[in-house]
Amino acid sequence: MELQTAARYRLLDELRGLDLISMMLYHGMWDVVFLFGVAQKWYTGRPGFVWQQSICWVFILLSGFCLPLGHHPFRRGAVVFGAGALVTAVTLLFLPEDVVWFGVLTLLGSSMLLTAALDPLLRRVPPAVGVAVSALLFWVTYPTMNGFWNLPGGRLALPQALYASYTTAYLGFMPKSFFSTDYFPLLPWLFLFWAGYFLHHLVGRGRLAPLRRSVCPPLGWTGRHSLVLYLLHQPVILGVLTVAFRLVRAG
């Protein structure tokens, strides 16, 4: 999630940091509602959904946009994918009722690895076409988990045979028995990542100079250390909330 470049684009770091803080607040509220039983209708309703979607859309689009700025995309992708596997292992061992299969880190790592592997082919696509097609395919495949795809004239029902296993769930076709508290399959989210990737090439490196300025350095620090902070934030928040709720209930 970090930009690996000597002359950093600080505004991108700060945008990532702001989005990460929003994610931390969202996850903190998730703990309050689902682990500590404090009902919040707005959070479980449409406002909470819009908040969650705004976080992941920015995070994934920005990750795709920033990928061409970094070095060693295969190594970076492997690290992020490994971090996703770590999250799965930890939740499976310690929070099996809230296990994470194919969460956002697994998605980002997979997208980085696939994009790095396909980069010679993707670079042949005109950037404007790439942005438009990626956005269209994101819209088409957005309801994959619900059993259909969007089409201009209506919906295309997908064969239920596709929704067969955890392997198909990784792609976006999750069976009814599948459960994950954080689920970001390749479909549709890879296309949002690619929209960011092509948007970077559409803008062009020469027009990114304004993004080097800084507006809020603390947000930049948060953005530069986003992977570590992401891995640590939920245990820390959960610990703080556990102590806080015990004190409140004891009093």
Give the ranges of each region predicted by the language model.
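Alpha-helical transmembrane segments and their immediate juxtamembrane cytosolic regions
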Residues: 1-251
